[in-house]
Curated annotation (Swiss-Prot):
It comes from Shewanella baltica (strain OS155 / ATCC BAA-1091). Coiled coil: none annotated. Pfam families: A_deaminase (PF00962). It is an enzyme of class 3 (hydrolase). Substrate binds at H14, D16, G170, D279. GO terms for biological process: adenosine catabolic process; hypoxanthine salvage; inosine biosynthetic process; nucleotide metabolic process; purine ribonucleoside monophosphate biosynthetic process. This is Adenosine deaminase. Zn(2+) binds at H12, H14, H197, D278. Its EC number is 3.5.4.4. Catalyzes the hydrolytic deamination of adenosine and 2-deoxyadenosine. The lineage of its organism: Bacteria, Pseudomonadati, Pseudomonadota, Gammaproteobacteria, Alteromonadales. It catalyses: adenosine + H2O + H(+) = inosine + NH4(+); 2'-deoxyadenosine + H2O + H(+) = 2'-deoxyinosine + NH4(+). Gene3D superfamilies: Metal-dependent hydrolases. GO terms for cellular component: cytosol. The gene is add. HAMAP family: A_deaminase (MF_00540).
Length: 331
């Protein structure tokens, strides 16, 4: 099912959406933070999906517990380290971990730039202990507004040498992409790649805006593109990658069922698309789960799954030499 001769990658993976349940428990007790449960076992339903949520916003509330225990920069560093470990232990050869320093900092008023530094330090420590390639993507959390995103952007750009790209995430309907055009002009000026959450809660126009105005070369989720034939044609022609996260889309009620997921429609249209976990800690999944689902529920053949793996390597924010090195390591 997973072709071991092809690098296995996860490109849409939120670092702050992958905090271990036991880490939430331990950090909560260490810092005297009131948790919603009185045991590790009963904590899980508050931080992980049980079935599916009614909306993206309800899903995101699970994430609040994950960042709610980040009481100091050591906690941030620990979570970053464990993200590297989890990526390696799930069999990934390469992962792009994205994170929102404003979101991670806000509960305990941590310095935004300090959060970025702690994430970088935690990832570096993890890479000394685990055999996996990791790159970082900074997130601007649109839900907190333009001013907050300016603070976030400045904290991230201060460490731009440790990033490969910037992302726009959060409440797509309430805070449309055009509010952040100036932010992403600065991202382009910094020579960072751009991806954006779009076409998840909003329609195809959100994707057009992300591509044409923000400068996105990849789109997170993008499920609503299928209702716009011109956009589908554009995506295929220009090799705009779709970072697909089927289980997350089910959990957020973006799609009603796996059978309703448009993954097959994208593939049949020749759109570059790959499989990702999104918030693996919240969804309680790993990349292997997504490939199993793609075969059993999305009805992809082994040959198609191998193409999806190759797509992921092509879509990755890597140089050609780095891509070749990933393949060479599989021989």
């Amino acid at each position: 099912m997973i072709d071991t001769s092809i690098p296995l990658v996860d490109l849409h993976r939120h670092l702050d959406g992958n905090v271990r349940v036991n880490t939430i428990w331990e950090l909560g007790h260490q810092h005297g933070i009131a948790l919603p449960a009185d045991s590790l076992e009963t904590l899980a339903p508050f931080v992980q999906i049980q079935g599916k949520e009614t909306s993206l916003v309800a899903f995101l509330k699970k994430l609040d517990w994950m960042v709610g225990v980040l009481a100091d920069l050591d906690a941030v560093k620990r979570v970053a380290y464990e993200n590297v470990a989890d990526a390696a232990l799930s069999g990934l050869d390469y992962a792009e971990l994205r994170f929102s320093p404003y979101y991670m900092a806000m509960n305990h008023k941590l310095p935004i730039e300090g959060v970025v530094e702690a994430v970088v330090d935690g990832v570096k420590a993890g890479l000394k202990d685990y055999n996996v390639k990791i790159n970082l993507i900074g997130i601007l959390s649109r839900s907190f507004g333009q001013a907050a995103c300016t603070q976030e952007l400045e904290g991230l750009l201060a460490h731009k040498q440790h990033l490969v790209a910037m992302d726009l995430a959060g409440d797509e309907m309430g805070f449309p992409g055009e509010l952040f055009n100036e932010h992403f002009k600065r991202v382009r000026d910094a020579d960072l790649a751009i991806t954006a959450h779009a076409g998840e809660a909003a329609g195809s126009q959100s994707m057009w805006q992300a591509i044409q105005e923000l400068g996105a070369t990849r789109i997170g989720h993008g499920v609503n593109a299928i209702h716009d034939p011109k956009l589908m044609e554009y995506l295929a022609k220009h090799r705009i990658g779709i970072e697909s996260c089927p289980t997350s889309n089910l959990h957020t009620s973006t799609v009603a069922s796996y059978a309703d997921h448009p993954f097959r429609t994208f593939m049949d249209a020749g759109v570059l698309i790959n499989l990702n976990t999104d918030d693996p800690g919240v969804s309680a999944i790993d990349i292997n789960h997504e490939y199993r689902i793609a075969k059993s529920e999305l009805k992809l053949t082994d040959a198609e799954l191998a193409q999806v793996q190759r797509n992921g390597v092509e879509m990755a924010f890597l140089s050609d030499s780095e891509r070749k090195a990933l393949y060479a390591a599989k021989v």
